[in-house]
């Protein structure tokens, strides 16, 4: 339970028997304990035992879903006593028989706690062992469950008692209250055992919106939501630009602080400290870029595309772009030419000529094609494409979008074919483009555009760097630094 970030402070123990678990509770620093016991003789013993412990309450009643009176079957082995008649239990344990039956009060747990003046907020853990009547008791404890973080419940795979709930029934009920079963043990028989349920753990990504730009945030969002879905956890994160643009589950201004931390330093599966580790990481705050080879995200393609559907004024902008593209006489090829901060390392500048070579081949099949250019330095690249009908953001109605990059991103998702940069921005747009059947990207060491599958490729190609190839794929700033470095090395070796 501790691995889920849960450290109980108050316990409700239903089916207390002799209350021997008190030592375990005290050892773990739990002060507030409420015992509920239906057997009058056992309840009396509990009251005597804990009479000098004011933080222990003993309630005599059979926990159920209704107030009333019911028959309680006391067996020769009193731990098997139950509201329900023996069934499979009689076959498995023939020496244990019903010794006698008595009438007891049945009551909802919620009502019993109110009667005794127990603050629901003081109870965050429930232990329940009432011989097949667990679901009845849970149905009467729905208010109490609101504050509970974990439950340990006796479960049945067969009806040991007539009409008793099976483990699947318990799972279904508690799932409706946002609990999941995380551990099950059956040490004595395959027909029954104990299960630990915890409130669906949260996992977070506090780096989302803080670590990199829009596309980095987009991949962080994809990761935390796909990981949470795989593990059946609840994702939490801050607000980010995608909250305005997409049909996402929005972030919160102050997400909860989670006790566990995990930093992802790898880019591929083989380097990842997360994707190859089957160990669950509940109550964990993840940080990293999570730009894995995208087959990792493929099983969740439908969910991702649903979350990343444009909404509001961004959906309207998409409609404007769609109308512009549909008005052209042929297919529209959306291209992304990243300049600005590119020109060093793996973020090389792909020359316009690589795109022109590819377009000239494509135009043989589609002579009426048009080219939409998305670029952070449009004036520097536009003239190279003068031989083609060109489209840019300037051809669209003016807008006052809060996120000025959104028009180009949306346009990239609408292309009939798509040529990207070695950029997570246009790669992410390719993942959302459902129209195109042809995607190409610049491959540095081959100095050309090559086809790729957006849902089965590395987000960034890292095999070569701009400095390895030459100045034509470097920025002026990077070239200057490179020349300075070479000159400095030359002096050093000359001096030596």
Model region roles, listed by residue range:
Residues 1-202:
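Phosphate/nucleotide-binding beta-alpha loop and adjacent structural elements of enzyme active sites
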Residues 35-39, 233-243:
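A short beta-strand-loop structural module common to alpha/beta enzyme folds
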Residues 41-45, 160, 242-247, 343, ...:
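Short, charged/polar "capping" segments at the starts of alpha-helices
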Residues 204, 240-368, 467-479:
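Secretory-pathway luminal glycosyltransferase catalytic domains
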Residues 209-219, 344:
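A short, glycine/small-residue-rich beta-strand->loop->alpha-helix junction that serves as a flexible
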Residues 364-457:
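Donor-binding and catalytic core of enzymes assembling or modifying cell-surface/extracellular glycoconjugates
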Residues 427-496:
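Nucleotide-sugar donor-binding patch of glycosyltransferase catalytic domains
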């Amino acid at each position: 339970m501790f691995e889920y970030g849960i450290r109980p402070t108050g316990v409700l123990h239903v089916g207390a028997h002799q209350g021997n678990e008190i030592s375990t509770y005290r050892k773990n620093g739990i002060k507030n304990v409420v015992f509920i016991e239906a057997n009058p003789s056992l309840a009396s013993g509990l009251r005597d035992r804990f009479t000098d412990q004011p933080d222990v309450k003993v309630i005599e009643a059979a926990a159920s879903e209704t107030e009333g009176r019911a028959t309680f079957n006391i067996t020769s082995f009193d731990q098997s006593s139950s509201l329900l008649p023996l069934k499979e239990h009689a076959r498995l344990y023939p020496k244990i028989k019903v010794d006698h039956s008595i009438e007891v009060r049945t009551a909802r747990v919620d009502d019993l706690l109110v009667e005794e003046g127990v603050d629901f907020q003081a109870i965050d853990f429930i232990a329940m062992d009432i011989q097949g009547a667990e679901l009845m008791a849970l149905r009467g404890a729905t208010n109490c469950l609101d504050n509970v973080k974990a439950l340990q419940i006796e479960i049945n795979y067969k009806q040991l008692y007539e009409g008793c709930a099976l483990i699947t029934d318990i799972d279904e009920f508690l799932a409706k209250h946002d609990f999941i079963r995380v551990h099950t043990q059956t040490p004595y028989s395959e027909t029954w055992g104990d299960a630990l349920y915890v409130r669906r753990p949260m996992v977070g990504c506090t780096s989302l919106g803080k670590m990199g730009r829009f596309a980095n945030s987009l991949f962080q969002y994809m990761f935390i939501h796909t990981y949470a879905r795989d593990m059946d956890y609840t994702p939490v994160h801050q607000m980010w630009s995608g909250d305005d643009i997409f049909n996402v589950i929005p972030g919160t201004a102050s997400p909860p602080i989670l006790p566990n931390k995990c930093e992802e330093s790898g880019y591929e599966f083989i380097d990842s400290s997360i994707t190859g580790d089957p160990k669950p990481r509940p109550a964990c705050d993840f940080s990293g870029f999570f730009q894995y080879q995208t087959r990792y995200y493929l099983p969740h393609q439908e969910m991702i595309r649903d979350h990343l559907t444009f909404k509001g004024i961004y959906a309207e902008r998409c409609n404007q772009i769609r109308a512009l593209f549909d008005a052209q006489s042929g297919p529209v090829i959306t291209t992304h030419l990243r300049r600005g901060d590119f020109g060093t390392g793996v973020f090389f500048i792909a020359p316009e000529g690589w795109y022109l070579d590819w377009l000239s081949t494509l135009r043989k099949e589609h002579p009426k094609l048009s080219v939409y250019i998305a670029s952070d330095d449009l004036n520097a690249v536009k003239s190279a494409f003068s031989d083609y009908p060109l489209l840019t953001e300037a051809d669209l109605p003016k807008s006052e979008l809060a996120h000025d990059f959104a028009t180009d991103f949306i346009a990239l998702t609408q292309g009939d074919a798509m040529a990207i940069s070695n950029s997570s921005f246009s790669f992410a747009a390719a993942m959302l483009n459902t129209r195109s059947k042809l995607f190409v990207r610049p491959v540095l060491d081959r100095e050309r555009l090559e086809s790729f599958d957006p849902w089965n490729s590395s987000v960034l190609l890292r095999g070569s760097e701009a400095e390895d190839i030459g100045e034509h794929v470097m920025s002026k700033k990077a070239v200057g630094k490179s020349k300075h470095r070479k000159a400095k090395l030359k002096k050093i070796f000359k001096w030596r």
